[in-house]
UniProtKB/Swiss-Prot annotation:
Keywords: Cell outer membrane, Ion transport, Membrane, Porin, Signal, Transmembrane, Transmembrane beta strand, Transport. Pfam families: Porin_4. This is Outer membrane porin protein BP0840. It is found in: Cell outer membrane. The keyword Ion transport applies. It comes from the Bacteria. To bacterial outer membrane proteins and porins. One of its GO terms (molecular function) is porin activity. Changing I29T: In strain: 10901. Homotrimer. InterPro entries: Gram-neg_bact_OMP, Gram_neg_porin_domain, Porin_dom_sf, Porin_Gram-ve, Porin_Neis. GO terms for biological process: monoatomic ion transmembrane transport. One of its GO terms (cellular component) is pore complex.
Amino acid sequence: MKKTLLAAALLAGFAGAAQAETSVTLYGIIDTGIGYNDVDFKVKGANADDSDFKYNHSRFGMINGVQNGSRWGLRGTEDLGDGLQAVFQLESGFNSGNGNSAQDGRLFGRQATIGLQSESWGRLDFGRQTNIASKYFGSIDPFGAGFGQANIGMGMSAMNTVRYDNMVMYQTPSYSGFQFGIGYSFSANDKDADAVNRVGFATADNVRAITTGLRYVNGPLNVALSYDQLNASNNQAQGEVDATPRSYGLGGSYDFEVVKLALAYARTTDGWFGGQGYPVAVTLPSGDKFGGFGVNTFADGFKANSYMVGLSAPIGGASNVFGSWQMVDPKLTGGDEKMNVFSLGYTYDLSKRTNLYAYGSYAKNFAFLEDAKSTAVGVGIRHRF
């Protein structure tokens, strides 16, 4: 009996030591609901004799990944001694309505990184993950970089869900509230829709990306700066090669306890990063395609100033209400119309891991097209594990 107890104690000790050296965590989010989306726009005929092209369609049904994208992932660390750790994160996005993989069918499309970290010098990662702007502005956006059309990425394309493949990223620890990050991608999108022409053997045959930023977080104050740049591949069309999309971002929030105020500004030139893109893709009678800018779009001469004002407030101990206004003033888009987005959201916590949500968003001059409108509303449930 004593030998059995001794053996059990030794095994428990070994298990504890192993656990202290290596840790692997399974985590995830399931977000599903019911929603309605209506898109209405008209394109004038190219000539006086041409009829206008009208588009007015709506859909009602299941929605998923609204508050946060549905996902599952593995996060691990190994203690290497002297405060140094090996780290990895594999995160797979999926559609909780039908079970399909997200992020163009990638197995770990949300994140696939391995690296080293230390409390003294920071963290170095290799692989696919979000850019610095997405990391730093998510906590400033009243919608937490979620809720589809309502989030900050609708008007400030580099600030939400922009992911780069083949990236080396370094982030410092937090020094008195300050943190700096920088990353470089050798090939930003290996699953480019035009992979034959845009992904090649030579380094310059691939779209490359730079992302960097600085933030300050101290108590109720949160301030962030960011910069992103795309370098065209040699195989792209001439107009695209001449373009070097850039995005500059500045934003901040302050929590007054009864209400939290958020402000943000972005300047985008020569293209659109479009981490989420627009939900409409239509081929016009002329053969031209309409649908706003997609992911990592190159457009020489394009310029846009974007603004966001947001508020959020707790109601009781379990509810939050939040809203924002975004405006994008573009140039050289073909339409050049100012886009305004008005959004309102609400969450109710059923527990620490499960909550209900509702939101509504209305966009005028949607995708920079005159009188184009997009309305999105939805209710759902989110569970974290």
